[in-house]
Amino acid sequence: MWAAYLGSYTALAAALTVAGEPMRLVDVFGLLFGRNAADFAALLPGGALGTAAPAARWLLLAWFVLPLLAMWAATLLPEGVRGAMNQATQAAPAGESYLNLLPQADEHDRAVFLSRYFGLENKDYVKRFLQMNRGITILEDYSAGSNATTMLCMDTQSTFYRKYAFGKDGAKLAEQLDWLRAQQDRLPLCDILRSEEADGCCWYDMVYNPQAVGMFRYLHSNPVEKSRAILRAVLATLEDKLYKPTAVPADAEKIEKYIETKVDGNLKKLHEDRMLRELMSYDTLRINGVEYKNLPALDWMFDHDRLRNLFAKDPVGTIHGDLTIENIICRTDNDSWYLIDPNTGNLHESPFLDYGKLLQSLHGSYEFMMKTPRVAVQDNRIDFQLTRSAAYDALLAAVMEDLSARYPREQVESILMHEVIHWLRLMPYKLNKDRKRAAMFYAGLVMVANDVADFSEHKKETLC
């Protein structure tokens, strides 16, 4: 391109010289890019070329005008001819399009997307991202609390969800994909359209259906009784089709590793973080005007002997691992449902972890916190707009009633401790990826831990 520019300027200098106005290449640069660049007054008497031969002035005018006329004439060509010309001259290989790779539905989604994929820390993945998503339009970002990205996309054939991740997160997503394939004959799960694992990247596409919505939305747009019935069906199906057929005895070594990694490891990360270290120095916190014991004041809850005794009685088997409200998908046109986004690598694979995840939603209000944009911290005070619906309260009461009827009190206490540990496991991710709101999720951990402590000390018999 630059050689063509220089060739054009050199030819113009030679032509003007022949036409009676001696010009060097440097003079052409001065004419085109100097103070009076593209000033046609230069052709008039008194201008830079006002005294030049008429042929030189007409030549310069033609040099400017003829390309403009050619571009205008190209717009008059038949559409088929113009399309063929565009295809022949495009820079990208035929069939490859990068025009619609930003989320189209929401401006905030576009900003987050650009920050995530074109920040310096992600530049190694940009090429793979472009190759993976050629020929599709990204409509909306549905990513939640993980390092994988979920986008609503469309191509020339259909609309679908695409989930993908790179590096270690890609390996984790590949484990999720293996779980979905292994359990597809046992459980109602999302339909996988296609997938690929290569070069440190994993992705898969899921069927999109406008009548399928997350249970959070379903719960707040339908009678609570319908959501209660679906949730009971989900738990009964998991019990009969997954937990019981895969049941094995509890493994003391895995319980020990679970405590060491998921409890001690995450507590250590909290104590080492500068912002949380200051918050954790107080004996109590005032969260939205209510006083709670701070986490260090509840350290007896994380005593190893206590946890070993609690978890030794846990049932063990294959589990979903991330049974939050948003991972239960409900159909609005009938009473069916299916599950998405399992989580592997929990070490202590107990159904009680699934129940704990469900309580992280219904008791801890995780989904409402995810929709809360900001938090204020001053000394030992943490304030944010915590919204909670009557529908959540009703569903929590139903779940606690079912758990209390099915399990003795000590096992319900174990389920509640797994909820606390889920909040504990969430914190390093929030400190790394969502630091501005991390104090709010720490407050969620503290509030849940206080409720569970009261239950363990028999100060209350239920959470609601």
Predicted regions and their residues:
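Active-site acidic catalytic loop and adjacent metal/ATP-binding pocket
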Residues: 150-153, 300-352
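ATP/Mg2+ or Mg2+-diphosphate-binding catalytic cores
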Residues: 389-464
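Active-site catalytic-loop/activation-segment of kinase and kinase-like phosphoryl-transfer enzymes
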Residues: 247-307, 390-396
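ATP-binding glycine-rich loop module of kinase domains
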Residues: 146-175
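Conserved HxN/HPN-centered segment at the entrance to the catalytic loop
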Residues: 184-197
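Conserved alpha/beta core of the MobA/IspD/sugar-nucleotide pyrophosphorylase nucleotidyltransferase superfamily
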Residues: 63, 78-156
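Conserved kinase catalytic-core helix
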Residues: 216-267, 301, 308-311
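Active-site activation/catalytic loop segments of kinase-like enzymes and analogous catalytic loops
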Residues: 344-403, 420-435
